[in-house]
Amino acid sequence: MPVKFSKVLIPQPRSKFIKVRCPDCGNEQVVFSHAAMVVRCLVCGRVLAEPTGGKARLAGHVVKILE
């Protein structure tokens, strides 16, 4: 009796890098989706992402999700 081989599933990460636009100055900056620290805009200093214990809460506009 032949043995059936099942497909080996490779786990993919759920976290991603996200390009965010600052609502005040329009600067685009790359932020980690599960940021553990407060992320501020490099130009004006506004908070773009704040940690929540899992995914970060984004305050800017998401421009692109980087793969």
Swiss-Prot record:
GO CC, alphabetical: ribonucleoprotein complex; ribosome
Keyword Ribonucleoprotein listed: yes
Protein name in the entry: Small ribosomal subunit protein eS27
NCBIfam families for this protein: PRK00415.1
GO biological process: translation
UniProt-annotated binding residues for Zn(2+): C22, C25, C41, C44
Family in the record: Belongs to the eukaryotic ribosomal protein eS27 family.
Assembly notes: Part of the 30S ribosomal subunit.
Keywords attached to this entry: Metal-binding, Ribonucleoprotein, Ribosomal protein, Zinc, Zinc-finger
PANTHER family, per database record: 40S RIBOSOMAL PROTEIN S27
Cofactor binding remark: Binds 1 zinc ion per subunit.
GO molecular function: structural constituent of ribosome; zinc ion binding
